[in-house]
């Protein structure tokens, strides 16, 4: 699985990265592992998966985490994840 993550502010990409996880875990575990790696790389706290976020990710393999998804204040508009490749 490859996931592309990017931080967006004022319609511009501030940071982006692609993280891969081709382990034997379930899809859900891989996604959570990748989210942890991305947050570590971007020096962010882990976002909260709201019901709407989960539904968007299930439907489109893509989701956005805005200020409502983070406990800490953020200096960007949103963080977006998109699955580029599945196992």
Where are these regions (language model features)?
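Amphipathic beta-strand/beta-sheet edge segments enriched in Tyr/Trp
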Residues: 3-6
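Acidic, low-complexity intrinsically disordered segments
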Residues: 34-87
